[in-house]
A protein has these predicted regions:
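Auxiliary, metal-adjacent structural segments of Zn-dependent hydrolase domains
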Residues: 112-167
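Conserved small/polar residues in nucleotide/adenosyl-binding loops
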Residues: 3-11, 331-338
Length: 338
């Protein structure tokens, strides 16, 4: 439950019949302690948006109970998302288990199995085009063990969740739109979102490892794009650079795996327009990686070069701004895909 929060409600993108079923089935449990606790940790700890799916990988249902995954070290939950504490997470899972049992949640789930099957089948038609081998060639491991969750009650919102250790689950949560029959539907453009979210599992650790070497340069870049980043809900230097790097690798995926309807050039222009105004430079720079794979077997091997690029870009940002301002590019056609 979103506990009366509109964080996960997107009025025009939910599945009306399913939303009504949720409200009708669970409304009599509004006073359950879980609901008041969710409100409490949302207000006091900011547990909302991606903090909720961030904890998903540490929860499982086993023998009719909601429990903390034995593979997950609850004492390190704050390493997955700093808004959680071990105490709040354990309390949340305990109350969630009680809610699960009191509401006979499995009965609700079984009643809607047909709807879930539609979502699963339709999402799989998008996933079938994913080139898992590309991930392996770029990072040394593929996404085969990544869980893809079809979410039917938070509109088009998409999230990624990571474990701390190799034994813990990692995955992505994919939202949906609806068709005229009120069933979950997915645009073929969603493949860009799926690739983007999957890449976070690889790019975030890479950037984190080298963050101390690009921190100062990132602090120089960020003020120039802060206003545009705020519109994208990237409210810090760190989140801005994480998204820049992840977007860069996403574009590289589509450069290597062309998709009808949107090209790497199109995606680069789109990201430039959003505020990552050094993206064209970034793609030009990455040709060095693509043309010298004999020297760089994976992106990890290339990270020192990425560090040098970020530092140089920061020192030359006046020219980056001039280049961007001088480009007379129309982005109107891009908006149809946003």
């Amino acid at each position: 439950s979103s506990a009366a929060s509109d964080v996960y409600k997107r009025q025009n993108n939910t599945i009306p019949g399913y939303t009504a079923d949720i409200d009708n089935y669970f409304s009599k449990y509004r006073e359950h302690k879980l609901i008041s606790y969710i409100k409490k940790i949302r207000e006091e700890q900011g547990i909302a948006y991606d903090a909720v799916p961030a904890a998903t990988g540490c929860i499982e249902i086993k023998r009719g109970k909601v429990i903390i995954d034995p593979q997950c070290d609850a004492s390190k939950i704050s390493m997955i998302d700093s808004r959680w504490t071990e105490e709040s997470f354990r309390t949340f899972v305990r109350l969630l288990n009680d809610f699960y049992r009191q509401t006979k949640f499995k009965d609700f789930y079984t009643l809607h199995r047909g709807l879930y099957d539609i979502a699963e089948t339709r999402l799989n038609t998008i996933l079938v085009d994913l080139n898992a081998e590309w991930f392996k060639s770029m990072f040394g491991e593929g996404p085969e063990n990544t869980i893809v969750v079809a979410s039917l009650c938070n509109g088009p919102g998409n999230y990624a969740f990571n474990g701390i250790t190799k034994g813990e689950k990692r995955g992505i949560v994919i939202g949906c739109s609806t068709d005229k029959e009120g069933n979950p539907a997915y645009s073929r453009f969603l493949i860009t979102v799926i690739v983007h979210e999957l890449l976070h599992h690889y790019t975030n650790p890479c950037l984190a490892q080298y963050w101390s070497q690009i921190d100062s340069a990132s602090q120089i870049i960020y003020p120039h794009v802060k206003e545009k980043m705020a519109k994208l809900a990237y409210g810090s230097t760190n989140s801005t650079m994480i998204e820049w790097f992840n977007n860069l690798l996403t574009i590289m995926y589509f450069k290597d795996n062309p998709n009808r309807g949107f090209t790497a050039t199109h995606l680069t222009a789109w990201r430039q327009h959003e505020g990552f105004i050094w993206m064209e430079r970034s793609m030009t720079f990455m040709e060095h990686f693509r043309n010298h794979r004999n020297l760089y077997s994976t992106i990890k091997d290339f990270m020192p070069e990425i560090v040098s690029f970020v530092n140089y870009t920061a020192s030359d940002f006046d020219n980056v701004l001039k280049e961007y301002d001088n480009k007379a590019v129309s982005y109107t056609h891009l908006r149809a895909h946003e």
